[in-house]
Every structure is written in structure tokens, then in C-alpha cells.
Amino acid sequence: KNHGYTLSAIEEDGFEKIHQIDALGTDDSQKGISISYANTILKFADFWQNNSFDLVCCLGDRFEMSAAVQASIPFGVKLAHIHGGETTLGAIDNVYRHQITLASQLHFVSTLDYKKKVEELTGTLENIYDVGALSLDNIPNFQPIEKMSFLEAFQIKNEDYVLVTFHPETVAVDSNITYAKQMIAALAELTKMLNIVITMPNADTLGSVYRKQIYQLKKTHPGKIVLVENFGKVNYFYLYYQILI
């Protein structure tokens, strides 16, 4: 609910049996994220106790995914990690990603360099496959949707616009207050020339700092700012297809 009902996209793809685990709190401070991490481990301890699978696929580097994986280790769950070996600057994602890699038995990486990193982490050359980035397969198959239907669905004007996506700083966390103010000041200047479409922050440390500033910007410039919690894959691709900046 807090991030645009992304579960609906999974249901629309035809997946019927979806296990839902509610473990995340609304506090996105450092302590709040840590508590959410711990709660996720506790919830998944029950999940792994009551469910078994031949293979579990783990995508990426989210702290929620890391917590689920950590809970699986005592149960000997066989894991396949997608997008291991990568490096993220300005975020603590590397720690979560490498944790998942070390717990996994199969690895599907997106480049040869990332394959080498997984080899370093695991100490073996076995079961590491350079398959490329999975999302790239969606791009050649992308078909532009009808423009006016898209604009009406998200209440975007049929004019030039800027797309803004900002990930909170999760290494130097206290810098987010300054970064948020700088971002909003820059966007306020852009409203003099262009419309702005902002994708809202996700569940990362101090994402609420940006939300507060973004809501204030929207209040100050209601006719120039559009806020979107969840575009979904096709709509986000289309946004890039039409984008000015």
C-alpha cells in the first residue's frame, strides 16, 4: 500500500499462490530499518519451517531479501542468486548482496566482471553463469502504449517533462537531509520551464525525508508536479520513450 500496490503486478502476471509476509514497519530510520530486518528474519523462520522447495531464486540486494536468505541458512534451503557480484556506490546494498551470494549455491550474473567477483567471494568457479541482465530481454519486446491513455492514467500534461528518480544515501545517512533540500531547490527552478514527474522513494533509510520535501514541492507547484508511487514496467519504459530529460 505504501509503495503503490506492487503486489498487483505479480498477480496480473498470473501467479496465483503468493505467500505474503508482513514484516516491514513504517519507521525508516536506521533503527527502524534494522528492526524491519530482524522482523523479516523472524517471519521467514516460520516460513522456512513450514515450506520446502527444490530451489529458491533470490533477486538483487534488498535488505528484505537478505533477511529472508539469512533465515533460510539453518534450514539448508538451496538458493539461486540473480545479479550477484555487482557494486553499488553510496549505498549499503553491497553488504546485503554479498551476504546473499555467500548463502547461495547457484549464481546468475550480468557481466564477466561480476562473475569474477562472485568467484572471489565464494572461492570456487563452479555454478556461476554469466547470463546478462534479465531485464534487458524486456527492451526489444517493448511496444509503445497509446500516449493519451498513459497521460490520462497518471494525470500528466501533454507537454515536455522531466523524470526524477532519487535513491536515498544509505552510507552517509545524515547527508540525506542536505541532499533532499538541494534536490527540491533544483526542481523548484525547473518548474519555471518544465513539468516534473517524480517517482517516489522506496523503503530505504530516510526515504521519508525526501517524501516530506517532495510533498511540499507538490503543494507549492501543484500544476507542475506529478507524483507516482508505482509506474510498473511497461509504463516506466514508456516514460523513458517519451522523456525530455
Segments from the language model and where they lie:
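Donor-nucleotide binding loops and adjacent catalytic segments primarily
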Residues: 7-10, 145-241
